[in-house]
Amino acid sequence: MSKDPVPLKAVHHIEFWVGNAKQAAYFYRKAFGFDQVAYSGLETGNRDRASYVLEQGRIRMVFSTPLNSNNGISEHIKAHGDGVKDIAFHVDDAKKCYDACIDRGAKSARKPETLSDENGSVTKASIFTYGETLHSFISYNDYDGPFLPAVSYTHLTLPTIYSV
């Protein structure tokens, strides 16, 4: 029996590109009980998008929205509407998985690179699957942060909203 050339450990996250990430994140928190664990936007120095990272158990979703109309997310949403942009996988070796896919004819979206911050580092690489949808491979080198490094994410503690 041959060895799996792209051994996947788990789904790391699914990223949705949407017109209103704040509203989408609110809906998933209130309707399905997800917790918001990280945020990136103008307040964290990210000038092109706002992203909300939600978690429930081992499920992690990211809702990203453009902060201006001259950006790839804006163009993608205009062409396709809200939807999944990236299904990212947790793997032992992102470069090895990426190389195995490229060797088998996959089209590169993002060559392997190491992302680092004060919480450690990860290696991330991406390939195109069908259309403009991506599969990313993420391997943890020594990372112990809330989501991914070098993205200016900050932990959020959200107040409970009570209705009368």
Where are these regions (language model features)?
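C-terminal catalytic ATP-binding subdomain
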Residues: 123-141, 146
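Single conserved hydrophobic/aromatic residue that forms the stacking wall/gate
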Residues: 155-164
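Intrinsic-disorder/low-complexity coil detector
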Residues: 4-6, 145-148, 158
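Vicinal oxygen chelate
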Residues: 2, 8-9, 15-26, 30, ...
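Short, compositionally biased segments
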Residues: 150-153
